[in-house]
Amino acid sequence: MNAPITQKNTAYISSDKLSLLELENSNKFINLLMVDGKKSRAIRLFYDTLVLLKRKNLKENSKKESLLGIIGQLSPKNSIEDLVNNSNKLSNNSNEEIKIPLIDNSKSDDKSNLLETISVLEVLSIALKNVTPSVELRKVRRAGNTFLIPAILSQHKANTLAIRWVIESAKKKQQNSKQNFAECLADEIYQAYLKQGKARQKRDELHSAAISNRANIRYRWW
């Protein structure tokens, strides 16, 4: 029998301080990823996704730091030209390392220092928060007609729906992609973190539909 995630069995993610909400989101995510009762496989898939998500977040932050470093090293005379050339070089030549003079902190690894400041589970929590709906639409029949009535969602149901949307979006993305499911899932989570992606679109569409049907609230019986 597989135990739920605790701070003890996630100790190897040393930079991530797990809050109660993050633990709850992680356990719920694993349960919704599970197929045919294979929880160990779902746990492995979840942590593969976290590793890919952390690399993606680290890569994006490294690009931002590199661009800030470029701006800091500009000369007053040709600052605009340097900025354009170096930023194009940074975006187009991803395999080529751009060396930027930074403050020497002995021989410490800049990436490891940056890694310590990034919590991948915090990214996951923010991503889920960005796609979590606050309302749902319930069908009610009145005089032979069916009306869609906005209703407030409980926090548990809203979080579950957000996770389902992210997983479903990743599955659809995998059908038209050469990436594996963990890569697609990490990409969808990161898109949600940026308030983008299919899951965010579903949330916005649901909220728009709720606003459009707000006049039907008078038919609510609960």
Swiss-Prot record:
Disulfide cysteine pairs (residue numbers): none
UniProt KW RNA-binding keyword: yes
Compartment(s) where it occurs, according to its Swiss-Prot or TrEMBL record: Mitochondrion
SUPFAM superfamilies: Ribosomal protein S7 (SSF47973)
Keywords annotated in UniProt: Mitochondrion, Ribonucleoprotein, Ribosomal protein, RNA-binding, rRNA-binding
Pfam families: Ribosomal_S7 (PF00177)
GO terms under cellular component: mitochondrion; ribonucleoprotein complex; ribosome
GO biological process: translation
Main location: mitochondrion
GO molecular function: rRNA binding
UniProt family annotation: Belongs to the universal ribosomal protein uS7 family.
Function: One of the primary rRNA binding proteins, it binds directly to 18S rRNA where it nucleates assembly of the head domain of the small subunit.
PANTHER family: RIBOSOMAL PROTEIN S7
Subunit relationships: Part of the small ribosomal subunit.
Name of this protein: Small ribosomal subunit protein uS7m
Organism field: Prototheca wickerhamii
